[in-house]
Amino acid sequence: MKRPPVPLLQNGVRADGRTPDQMREVKIAVGVVSNADGSAMVSYGATTAVAAVYGPREMHPRHLSLPDRGVMRVRYHMAPFSTKDERKSPTPSRREIEISKILREALEPAIVLEQYPRSRIDVFVEILQADGSTRVASLTAASLALADAGIYMRDLVVGVSVGLVDGTVVLDLNGLEDQYGEGDLPLGYMPNLKRFTLLQLDGAWTRDMFLQALNLAVRGAEYVYQIARDALKNKYMSIAEEIYGR
């Protein structure tokens, strides 16, 4: 394995100055795409994801519709300028196709698709800048965009990542930690229902490390959830003020 250009963890401090249990700065905005039914932008540090939702609308072709529930389709894409890799193709890669499927499966437990028979809901996620944890930032953005679109939901899904760096469990992997760390654990969590909708494990984890990672992920997800809820509330409070006055 290649050595990282800088020490990832030194005296309990990570390369970017964070402690192991600290998220990067989280920024969330809702309603950022004017022509979408719902949209959101989520930043975890330098990683930025934008999600746009269209629907529910009639399924075409009709033979793909389901009589008792709606169909949700998710497309994850990394903008060609999102990474330093100049060879990034605008066409979907195998990884993008895989993550699109992962995101759909992580979102579906939160969506009441039975409310939308013979309909489809399209979710588009674009990574504008990538510095680790892109799939979990995308998951949070997509969940918020669905809520912004007024889709019936059981709960928001918040994505966070936990990893192993020099044998230490850390929250919210940045790009260096993602590339050079010993383990990666992206998770999706519904804070009100206290249920995981996504859990992928990469690397060698002991039982104690895994349990510590789950606890850290829940704390991180609950922190992000508060910011996400405030972003939704602020948007609709501002709309109400415009309609009814202060």
UniProtKB/Swiss-Prot annotation:
- Could you tell me one molecular function GO term of this UniProt entry? RNA binding
Alphabetized InterPro entries for the sequence: ExoRNase_PH_dom1, ExoRNase_PH_dom2, ExoRNase_PH_dom2_sf, PNPase/RNase_PH_dom_sf, Ribosomal_Su5_D2-typ_SF, RNase_PH, Rrp41
Q: Which GO terms describe its biological process?
A: gene expression; rRNA catabolic process
Q: Which UniProt keywords apply?
A: Cytoplasm, Exonuclease, Exosome, Hydrolase, Nuclease
Report the SUPFAM superfamilies cross-referenced here.
Ribonuclease PH domain 2-like, Ribosomal protein S5 domain 2-like
EC number(s)?
Answer: 3.1.13.-
Please give the GO cellular component terms listed in this UniProt entry.
cytoplasmic exosome (RNase complex)
Tell me where in or outside the cell this protein is found: Cytoplasm
Described by its record, this protein's role is as follows:
Catalytic component of the exosome, which is a complex involved in RNA degradation. Has 3'->5' exoribonuclease activity. Can also synthesize heteromeric RNA-tails.
What protein family is recorded?
Belongs to the RNase PH family. Rrp41 subfamily.
Oligomeric and partner information: Component of the archaeal exosome complex. Forms a hexameric ring-like arrangement composed of 3 Rrp41-Rrp42 heterodimers. The hexameric ring associates with a trimer of Rrp4 and/or Csl4 subunits.
Record's protein name: Exosome complex component Rrp41
Species per Swiss-Prot/TrEMBL record:
Pyrobaculum aerophilum (strain ATCC 51768 / DSM 7523 / JCM 9630 / CIP 104966 / NBRC 100827 / IM2)
